[in-house]
Amino acid sequence: MNLEKNREVMIENQLRPNKITNNDVLQVFMSTSKEKFISEDKKNICYSDQDISIKDQRGYLKNLHLAQILHFAEIKNNEKVLHIGGLTGYLSVLIAKLCNKIYVTDNDQEFVENIINNFKNNEVTNGKVIKEEFSEGLKGEEPYDLIIIDCPQYNFNLDLLSQVNVGGRIIYIEKINEELSKAYKMIKYQDNFSKVFLFDVFSNFYLTKQEERFNF
């Protein structure tokens, strides 16, 4: 199996035709071996047009969605980014190659260790990995220019806006039902914020279980 060739085909057949044309974004995909971030039994599908389950109800969305996140994030090389829910570090490494400083959180110690190891293996020197609950963001290192949460979630914590600069962005995916989610981009202003729809996501993944609601 020629995984490097598969990576090239993925870029040409999945990303470019869907308006992912930024050379910096395409280059980080080309220079990062996704197969090294997933289990041996899934390496043969890592560049195919499908989600890749990692653990429980979490995993990597299809390659196009990861590329769309980076495309709409418009990451600059002087920016500080918080990536919430790093899994094994694949998207975190892609982000790290585009920004000045990246902080990555996960609530799973195994994933935290995976990200640390994969940062070393990919010579990422501008990243820091912390075990933290997803809804908390990361206090003490803010403000961030950008927060990325790539796993669909039922409940978005608006308090995360307090952790970004004025003019800062949050890219996140709001879970509508079991199958459908919608990606949004928030931009923070002095006294308010905007929320713009980006793209639909069809995935069973979710960051945390939906909170139960009781009607009295």
Predicted regions and their residues:
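Conserved nucleotide-cofactor-binding alpha/beta core module
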Residues: E74-S194
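Class I SAM-dependent transferase core
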Residues: M1-L94, L98, E110-T125, Y189-Q210
